[in-house]
């Protein structure tokens, strides 16, 4: 089964770094609608940011 990750998040979405031990968090206030907006948001460490569950 192929899983497609949704990287376009709505305003208010809280994201956290996927890197073990990082834990930084970012809240999306205004989603990006630019070319390449389907790419994952990333932490400065380089790992993807994922929605907080």
From Swiss-Prot:
Binding of Cu(+) 3, residues: 24, 32, 43, 45
Residue positions assigned to the propeptide: 1-6
Alphabetically ordered keywords of this record: Copper, Metal-binding, Metal-thiolate cluster
Binding site for Cu(+) 4: 24, 32-33
Keyword Metal-binding listed: yes
Induction: Up-regulated by copper, cadmium, cobalt, nickel and zinc, but not manganese. Copper and cadmium salts afford the strongest metal-dependent induction at about 1,000-fold. Also highly up-regulated under conditions that are believed to be attained in phagosomes of interferon-gamma-activated macrophages, including production of nitric oxide and reactive oxygen intermediates, mild acid (pH 5.5), and cell wall perturbation. Repressed by RicR.
Residues bound to Cu(+) 1: 17, 22, 34
GO MF term (any one): copper ion binding
Superkingdom classification of source: Bacteria
Membrane-spanning parts: none
Binding-site list for Cu(+) 2: 17, 19, 45
Observed phenotype of the null mutant: Cells lacking this gene show hypersensitivity to Cu(+) toxicity but not to divalent heavy metals such as Zn(2+). Deficiency of MymT does not impair M.tuberculosis virulence in mice.
Alphabetical GO biological process terms: response to cadmium ion; response to cobalt ion; response to copper ion; response to nickel cation; response to zinc ion
Family statement drawn from the similarity comment of this UniProt entry: Belongs to the metallothionein superfamily.
Main function: Metallothioneins are small proteins that have a high content of cysteine residues which allow them to bind heavy metal ions through clusters of thiolate bonds. MymT binds up to seven ions of Cu(+), with a preference for four to six Cu(+) ions, in a solvent-shielded core. MymT protects M.tuberculosis from copper toxicity.
More details: NO and reactive nitrogen intermediates (RNI) can displace Cu(+) from MymT.
The name this protein goes by in its record: Metallothionein
Gene: mymT
